[in-house]
């Protein structure tokens, strides 16, 4: 596909000039060569190949009554890759889409598609038919694998494509159910039955070849197509499982959607370590606790909103203390210190990370220091809520002035833009060179997140650029206001956005969901007073709205929807 070939054409994206090459390099040292003996393109495909031998009979995946070993998973992926090429004619650079929740077939497609030379495009299972249609057209997918529960949405999406005279992708059902045997669609299990495990893997010729497309999560109205490389996926997979403390005996619960940042690269990372994957379609506190007890889950990932569900669930009282230590990797938005504290009281060990779709998921890690244990709980958990240091595979991270590109002072108060530079930054936005150039301007990836740098080098997010409330000329960090709101005993969830104001320009408007039992016992005035007692008055919300908060599939609150609601309220003054 010509669009993907262009990904390998050098483009001058960075304004800053690269450093001059050293006067002496390995190429000028006599007797050294680079050849196939010492240079092989990196690809996470190799993780599965190794695990099929090293951990042959170990359990690779469990889903209800379904259970596979690593040898079986490797066998199935080879047969599927074979069928993709022989049955559908998938060629290197072709896009294969998926539309499903976390089931075994989606895990297998993370290997089978790149084994066939294809590019995996995992679509958000909560998208409606219009969005699915738009993303299929944009990605130019040749195939789409769909689970039966989402078939009607997928059909409607394909119909929309046909109405626009766009050739729709071939639909493959992810089922072996007898009720679908008479359907006109290809079936996943039929492909497996007709595939060959003698298939010769189509390895990337260049480790920077695309392995997947991930559309941004939808906290903005127009998702972008982020392209991951084999190299970036390989490096971030290893770094993530190492920093999460995962090994051969680890049991990983799939609470992070695999359609989001390829599940933070854990499909490939779990294979690298030969860990066991536990798949679940629906995430709930009950499902998490049940699997911890049933399958001895040792690790899982979740957005702070899921942690908030856990600590406020009756299930927590029934199942804690936990029977063994469970490591939780959380990211997506700054977690309230109070939530981290309660999680650890229940027996979870919280590992706070921060990243974006554009950084293959995790890009930082809040490394906990032994001396923090001696601090008062409030101070200790505030430190753990920071975003921390650069991730193991991310070479550089900084907080910089977005205009001068100078590093801000490490004083914990000077605000700048969080920026990254490294091998796990995306290749770019597919079909959007302008956005790619803007994101990489100055030789760094600009996140759009505002933060500070502390004396110890740890960074801490203050807000998204677009979320800062400017009231009377003062910048109000919505994250700081939300942290105070979460400390109120009645508040389950909170989000702060700007409400237009004729006098002040903008004022903070808080959308709040109350805990069960507090529905009629707390007023907006009480919430406002609580905040004014703990914040400068200009930072305290002037408006409080009680309602359920809209979220993405990964649990991130959709502030753009709340902003529209606040805008519709008009001026408070």
UniProtKB/Swiss-Prot annotation:
Protein name (record): Probable CoA ligase CCL13
Domain notes: Both substrate-binding domains (SBD1 and SBD2) are involved in the substrate recognition, and are sufficient to confer the substrate specificity.
List of residues binding ATP: 216-224, 352-357, 449, 461-464, 556
Annotated spans, SBD2: 353-429
PANTHER family given in the database record: ACYL-ACTIVATING ENZYME, ISOVALERATE--COA LIGASE AAE2
GO cellular component: cytosol
Matching InterPro entries: AMP-bd_C, AMP-bd_C_sf, AMP-dep_synth/lig_dom, ANL_N_sf
Top-level EC class as recorded in UniProt: ligase
Region described as SBD1: spans on this chain: 284-352
A Gene Ontology molecular function term of the record: ATP binding
Keyword terms of this UniProt record: ATP-binding, Cytoplasm, Ligase, Nucleotide-binding
Natural source organism: Humulus lupulus
